[in-house]
Amino acid sequence: MGPKAAVFELSHIDKSFRDRDEVIHIARDLSWSLDAGHNAALMGESGAGKTTLMNIIAGLDHVDSGDVRVGGQSLTTLSSSELTDFRRRALGLIFQKFHLVPSLSAWDNAALQARLAGVFAADFAEHLFETLGIEHLRHRHPGQLSGGQQQRVAIARALMHRPQLVLADEPTGNLDEATSDKVISLLVEAASDAGSTLVVVTHSAAIAGHLTSTWRLASGSLIHAA
């Protein structure tokens, strides 16, 4: 049996865009992969391209050249509809803004992606809500929840379908320091329970300390910082 495929793999990718008369390089012949059982913090200065790199891994942005694979599947070969279906099944996405549906309860918001993917499992949903400390909030709507509670619901939504890969872009950017530390700790624990590899974009060294490795993006290159 051959070696197990990396959860995601960027192979010699290039990505740039023009800002007035200047060419901004997000990636220059950049390669990066992460195996199952590992997670990573992605750091860098503002404008370095961290969010763009995450969008490339998620298939939300294209590369100028190179290959992007998730679970061994090349995203560059998929049609738009195939990519949407693949993303729904294989990825969990968490953003600084929670994007919860106001008319749905916390439970139905969290179950949304798993139900769309046809893999909703009530027992795992119960486990996630207990792990994240929101089991008593299941019937409340987003407007009745604090920012930290809403982010925990968003985390449950991203993990409930047990995706191969979870990408979190500044997931605690709107939370205070104490709440942020608690939410990141719960995110790492819940991702492990779901069997998901986790990548977190952050400016915070404290948050990066919760992850097993830290990478820094600068001038189109990645440096393994810790």
Residue ranges and their predicted role:
Residues 1-16, 223-226:
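ABC-family P-loop ATPase nucleotide-binding domain
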Residues 7-8, 14-217:
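ABC family nucleotide-binding domain
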Residues 214-226:
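H-loop (His-switch) and adjacent beta-strand-loop-beta switch element
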